[in-house]
Amino acid sequence: MKEKYQKIDGYTEFFSFFFGENNKEEISKKLWAFAKKSMYMIDEEKDEAWKSLNSRIDDRLNKSEKYIQDKKITKVYVRTFGDKGNSETKSLLERFYKYIFSNKEVISLDSSNNSAPSSTLNKYTKYTKNKDHKSKNILFNYQVSHVFGKTLNCYAFTAPWNVVYLPKVLDPFTGHESKGELTEQFTEKLQEFVKSNYREQIREFNQTMEDLAPKVKQFKKEIKKEGNIKEDTLKQFFKSLDESFSKIDL
């Protein structure tokens, strides 16, 4: 008789052992209830935060260097592609943005890959992870997560609809480092919640992605034609670009 094998989810095992709960639907409901109660996003100032991000991109694209300096237009950041110490992957992303933005210095790479999103949340919410802050609620054992990923996209990396303070215990369920039903259900609920609360901003993002799509496609075509970059590196880079510059289903 052939032995039957089971699918074993480490998260379900954890909840069963510590809380006596092994029903995935119930676990999923409780996870989301806890998340809604304990997570913090840019809410009251979401319009200002979104307007500021888009204005800075537009100014860096269209205004003179003197105007940018005089008006103190702050930098616009994206996450590094691949290994931070890899000059080839760094150069790829920089070349992409110079192509997209007609050789204008619009973006900078976030040296820590999370400093800019943290600063954005710190600026536009009443919460911070800075333990020495004197005028905000200080969060411990929280981290910054991206609801939709898209961390190579300057319109998304620090967008108010994409950054959230989550308790570290919940971070695995956002889907970046784990798989399975619980992760899928939690990620879906988080994204649907954000879509319902930031719908107009996401619509604007989608329109921008539609406008940029021809340039993204042409860049990929031209850089592939050069033939001087490793095939595996290009394949991964194109995959990351597709994920970061795709529209969000509403």
List the predicted regions and their residue ranges.
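Generic detector of well-ordered alpha-helical segments enriched in charged/polar residues
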Residues: 12, 16, 28-32, 118-125, ...
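Generic surface-pattern signal
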Residues: 20, 36, 40, 58, ...
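Polybasic, low-complexity binding patches
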Residues: 156-158, 173-216
